[in-house]
Amino acid sequence: MYLSKADDQDWKYPQTEPYASGFLEVENGTHRVFWSEYGNPCGEPVICVHGGPGGGSDAFVARFFDPKRFRVLMFDQRGCGKSTPSASSNDLDDALRNNTTSHLIDDMNKLRVHRKIDTPMHVFGGSWGSTLSLSYAIAHPSNVRSLILRGIFLCRRKDSVSYTHLTLPTKA
């Protein structure tokens, strides 16, 4: 069964407010990564990796995890959401500068250290976030307890061709 945000009564875990949030300066201060945490500050750590590229984190995703059991860390990747500079502003060139998969993997690890997460994390990613989650797990296997992937997009040539040539039917 597909559950939308409108199906609030069907979700097992309630919407909660973050207990902490802030910005992490990366790349000598030229980028600031927004982060927020939900659930139990002493719980099993989960890092949520949003899709895109160009998307942003959504507090709704924290509802996948029991707030009594898990410490859910969300962040907006460089150029996305509340992170600065934003690709949706006039700072597009700045947002894209030093913004590669390697930079994002480093940001995830810096964020883990910044938030004092010293045990392996569950890594939860969707769409482009699944690709970034896999890349993080390859780069830092000792920091990953499990991978939870949804809507997997692997950035293979055939995936990209299918994605860029997707057309919707139009009315005649």
Segments the model singles out, each with a brief description of its role:
Residues T164-T170:
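Conserved small/polar residues in nucleotide/adenosyl-binding loops
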Residues G79-S102:
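Cap/lid segment of the alpha/beta-hydrolase catalytic domain
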Residues W11-R32:
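N-terminal cap/lid segment of alpha/beta-hydrolase-fold proteins
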Residues H103-P120:
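Conserved acidic catalytic loop of the alpha/beta-hydrolase fold
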Residues P120-K158:
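Conserved hydrolase catalytic core segment
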Residues E27-P85:
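Conserved HGGG/HGGXW glycine-rich cap/lid loop of the alpha/beta-hydrolase fold
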Residues M1-W11:
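N-terminal targeting or regulatory segments adjacent to alpha/beta-hydrolase or S9 domains
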Residues P85-A87, K158-Y163:
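Short aromatic-enriched loop/helix-cap "lid" or pocket-rim segments at secondary-structure transitions
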